[in-house]
């Protein structure tokens, strides 16, 4: 029955439960500011 095993190895489900954990965690790497400058903070509500 090696044929059925080959089918399973090619199957890649796209629903959220099968995504690797690092896929969810690595957003910080993308959003990280590499310029080294301090961010300009804009006040949206009065304090």
UniProtKB/Swiss-Prot annotation:
Annotated protein name in UniProt: Small, acid-soluble spore protein N
Please give the record's induction comment: Expressed only in the forespore compartment of sporulating cells.
A single GO CC term for this protein reads:
endospore-forming forespore
Q: Which family does it belong to?
A: Belongs to the SspN family.
**What's an example GO BP annotation here?**
asexual sporulation
Q: Show the Pfam families listed in the entry.
A: SspN
Per the record, the gene is: sspN
Which parts pass through the membrane? none
Q: Which domain of life is it from?
A: Bacteria
**Where found, per UniProt?**
Spore core
What keywords are assigned to this protein? Sporulation
Q: Which residues form the signal peptide?
A: none
Region feature (Disordered): 1-47
The record's principal subcellular location, in a coarse class, is: other
């Amino acid at each position: 029955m090696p044929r059925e095993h080959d089918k399973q190895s090619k199957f890649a489900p796209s629903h959220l439960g099968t995504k690797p954990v690092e896929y969810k965690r690595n957003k910080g790497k993308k959003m990280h500011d590499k310029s080294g400058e301090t961010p300009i903070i804009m006040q949206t509500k009065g304090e």
